[in-house]
């Protein structure tokens, strides 16, 4: 079902048929279609959705669509959405909304929720605390497997994940973790204390999100606990949230490799002046660097004038040099981004790149010398000069 078919059903007022079709679709696909519609049509279709599906669709809307819908919703509709949204999705929503919409949302929240929201909004934007959720399954080590399973069945539907459960003491200090798989296959009378893993890998609330992403990549976790400085469990970060972080970091890496200032805004949502500002600084630097190159070439004007054929090889030499530089910088920047290369490795990298460039340079020189002698038919001293350059 695409946007045109949906608009056709709306024009023909076949609302029941449209509702049945939407109920069978994935929430991500519905959100993508509604994002492209005008507000009136999107709101009409959104109100057709079953309540549970509507909440899931809302979580996948673009920030602009979420803002417009919140403005258009009744207080009752907004209250339901906020009650059903996972807490981390609500925080993401609030961080992107203007003050008037934030105030409208806070008015619909309980005093306890407002306290939690204010606490989350105080975390630095790129920290673990800013992307964690408080919806996790919490167990005590004195519980039996039977009691733990009953607790999961009672509270699991409102949690972000139940695959990993977190064991805390009465002060909420993290003591261990246990997977649902272990609970399912263990004896019902066994104690959580005897089954849990007490060597827990965790991150702290103020850790950078790149550090958190590295933990997920290294250990292949579905979720990672987040603790404060007193080792109290404050939340968890799930793999779906860290995937967004990885995508953002990868985008920034590509922008840096292309000599652009990183941008948090998607390309289609960025203004012309903002994009120009990101590019102009590095382009000016490259232009000035090219000016120095021009002066160097000018200083050899007499040589080039006496051996004019050398001029025709300048583009080849510059393009080859530029390409080799791009290859090296791409690999090194990617290594820095993934944590494979660290600052202490700078001399190792320089030594390795020197040996690589020496090997590649010799190979190119031999091939180029043969090409110039056999195809271009130039004199041997010119072939040697160009090849060694």
Task: Give a label for each model feature.
Residues 1-261:
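Hydrophobic packing positions in regular secondary-structure scaffolds
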